[in-house]
């Protein structure tokens, strides 16, 4: 089976999403499946890893996030899906990649979303941090 996992917010500092993807990839490969994961990067490039093929897509840094990136164009993701022809798609972001599920459904590609966060948790963590940074910046001017 060809499994494709797509995630924004994957990077050197990410913990849960990165760990989840690596554990999934390791398990799929042990069971004889092909595992590819698409993540944000500084450009387009591929690399083979012990946990599967990692494809980086051009991305932008999300302001006030501590360096997290999001894939710049979902069209690039859709084009890769068409090229890779996965049997199933796993999505690790229900916000910025939300259009991928309905798009895949129209093409009869099963898709599932992994929710690593709650909206209230995101607001509590990131909005508070962003506001604090903004206020501190403003006060230093």
Give the residues covered by each predicted segment:
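N-terminal subdomain of nucleotide-sugar transferases
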Residues: 1-56, 82
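Short amphipathic alpha-helical segments
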Residues: 49, 101-104, 126
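Membrane-proximal helix-turn-helix segments that form the acceptor-binding/catalytic region
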Residues: 106, 119, 133-141
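An aromatic- and histidine-rich active-site surface loop
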Residues: 89-121
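A short, flexible beta-alpha/helix-coil linker loop
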Residues: 9-12, 60-62, 120
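Glycine-rich phosphate-binding loop signature in dinucleotide/nucleotide-binding domains
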Residues: 80-87
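A short, charged, and often flexible helix/loop element on the N-terminal side
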Residues: 52-79, 127-133
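A short beta-to-alpha transition loop/helix N-cap that caps and shapes the active-site region
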Residues: 46, 120-124
């Amino acid at each position: 089976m060809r499994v494709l996992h797509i995630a924004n917010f994957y990077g050197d500092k990410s913990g849960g999403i990165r760990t989840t993807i690596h554990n999934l990839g390791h398990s799929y490969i042990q069971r004889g499946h092909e595992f590819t994961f698409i993540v944000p990067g500084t450009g387009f490039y591929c690399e083979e890893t012990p946990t599967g093929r990692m494809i980086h897509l051009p991305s932008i840094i999300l302001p006030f996030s501590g360096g997290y990136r999001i894939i710049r164009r979902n069209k690039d993701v859709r084009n890769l899906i068409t090229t890779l022809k996965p049997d199933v798609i796993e999505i690790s972001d229900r916000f910025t990649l939300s259009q991928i599920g309905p798009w895949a459904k129209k093409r009869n590609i099963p898709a599932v979303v992994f929710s690593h966060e709650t909206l209230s948790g995101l607001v509590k963590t990131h909005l508070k941090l962003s506001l604090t940074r903004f206020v501190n910046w403003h006060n230093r001017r």
